[in-house]
Amino acid sequence: MEKYSAESIKVLKGLEPVRMRPGMYIGSTGKRGLHHLVYEVVDNSVDEALAGYCDWIRVTLHEDGSVEVEDNGRGIPVDIHPEEGRSALEVVFTVLHAGGKFSKDSYKISGGLHGVGVSVVNALSEWLEVRVHRDGKIYRQRYERGKPVTPVEVIGETDKHGTIVRFKPDPLIFSETEFDPDILEHRLREIAFLVPGLKIEFEDRINGEKKTFKFDGGIVEYVKYLNRGKKALHDVIHIKRTEKVKTKNGEDEVIVEIAFQYTDSYSEDIVSFANTIKTVDGGTHVTAFKSTLTRLMNEYGKKHNFLKKDDSFQGEDVREGLTAVISVYVKNPEFEGQTKSKLGNEEVKEAVTKAMREELKKIFDANPELVKTILSKIMSTKQAREAAKRAREMVRRKNVLQNTTLPGKLADCSSTHREKTELFIVEGDSAGGSAKQARDREFQAVLPIRGKILNVEKSSLDRLLKNEQISDIIVAVGTGIGDDFDESKLRYGRIIIMTDADIDGAHIRTLLLTLFYRYMRPLIEQGRVYIALPPLYRIKAGREEFYVYSDQELAEYKEKLQGKRIEIQRYKGLGEMNPEQLWETTMNPETRKIIRVTIEDAEEADRLFEILMGNDPSSRREFIERHALKVKELDI
């Protein structure tokens, strides 16, 4: 038995706890956490911009896998810290909870973690180098895995001011260390919209691309950008106010800025920020926005005779087709979770409600035609929702009669043990027929679907439910959709989408994923939705047979089998395989290949669906042209 004494108790010093438990500080050590490192450094530069000391930021992706963030702010202080007895620069990069944010005099508003942020970035980097232009001198210090390897030294003179941070993520910490320029570009564009007049340059030296973002129109311009390709029903509505609020520490100010616009689309798009930090999970500002808008539209609905006395709009009616950007600035933001994805300040709710009620009443009372346009849109949504409810009730009534519940084309499995069962949604009747013969009837069910199904991105809920193929999928899965989703009624443990390996197959796969993403999202979040990977080729070499799943694999086999006589058969569709081959290659759990569909960042997935499935062909073309050379097979 090992001795358990004082020596067994490990004390983590400096940045060791960050390296031991990185997820606690940046959320994950996957793609999301990796990009979070860049956001932390950029957020510090943004705080300088918000304080009025910086109007330019440059982010550069270097060929060696490092990233550099430069600004023209004041430059991090380099003088000796009174408590630590060493340069403030070194303190900021090596001590948690050190930095300008914690002194009320340095920043009135800040979003970046200031010190927590850059010290965490330093801890999780293979190396980091910081240069500061300040007081006529250039200072530099280098760190490796969070530890200084050089002192703070003067390396030259300058007439500039600002900070340059360059770092390379540590492969010992991160599962992948390659930055995705699209993800960074998305965030940098967001910041430029939120801080009007701030110029952000982004250079990707790996792919040789340069972009500049500067938007003097602020969040009004942001709403127009989000609505490109959609038909707007009116001009963007914009409000901005500073509200005095009571807090635990007395009285504070909250700056509330909101821009919104209705379009002819069927989905809502609400993007929210607190101190420029994106609040993916919303918070008190979003809750207040939604409830205040719903209350106001109900008041005006009755005033303009759209609603009877006892009738009302629901929140979902008011938000369909709505695009909104909500940006608040608060002195002491309370973010829930280490990665700051939800705002918790109660006083913000009061500020947003008051600002919205007073400002929107002024706008609506001065523009009755604007109000009527919005109310007409909301009214048609309400009527469609009520029609969809009737259609859902019809689907439910069908469900009661057990023998007519399930679609006629569904070949069900015999097992009632949900977690062991699988539903294959198969493209085409002929492949569906082969799959029915190939399957293991004990635990595998097969539902064939015809050709191209309805595009759910462009369809209203009642139209969706009238579509026979979508209705078949909903009934077979069993959970219901949207607000009626009930996980306990799920009929299968896994849902596997099986389509041809061609463009049409990819299109149907995308449509099906859109259906699950928009209306049965918990199934994706729980990791229950999969994509089957049928082989692209069959190679015959003498008596041996190989199934090949990619062009790269084919090239490897050709090299390996050099000198032998080989026959190569390309499968254009699932229907070209006989049931035995289909079982062996695509359905047998022992030998098949399947990809689990995940939503690491729901917003990114949503953006992809919006581009590929929405109404803007130019965005779709730009996306495809941009990625066609990089990606052999686009898995979405």
From Swiss-Prot:
InterPro entries linked to this entry: DNA_gyrase_B_C, GyrB, HATPase_C_sf, Ribosomal_Su5_D2-typ_SF, Ribsml_uS5_D2-typ_fold_subgr, Topo_IIA, Topo_IIA-like_dom_sf, Topo_IIA_B
Enzymatic class: isomerase
SUPFAM superfamilies: ATPase domain of HSP90 chaperone/DNA topoisomerase II/histidine kinase, Ribosomal protein S5 domain 2-like, Type II DNA topoisomerase
Cofactor(s), by name: Mg(2+); Mn(2+); Ca(2+)
Pfam families for the chain: DNA_gyraseB, DNA_gyraseB_C, HATPase_c, Toprim
Task of the protein: A type II topoisomerase that negatively supercoils closed circular double-stranded (ds) DNA in an ATP-dependent manner to modulate DNA topology and maintain chromosomes in an underwound state. Negative supercoiling favors strand separation, and DNA replication, transcription, recombination and repair, all of which involve strand separation. Also able to catalyze the interconversion of other topological isomers of dsDNA rings, including catenanes and knotted rings. Type II topoisomerases break and join 2 DNA strands simultaneously in an ATP-dependent manner.
Name of the protein this chain belongs to: DNA gyrase subunit B
Organism: Thermotoga maritima (strain ATCC 43589 / DSM 3109 / JCM 10099 / NBRC 100826 / MSB8)
Name of the gene this protein is made from: gyrB
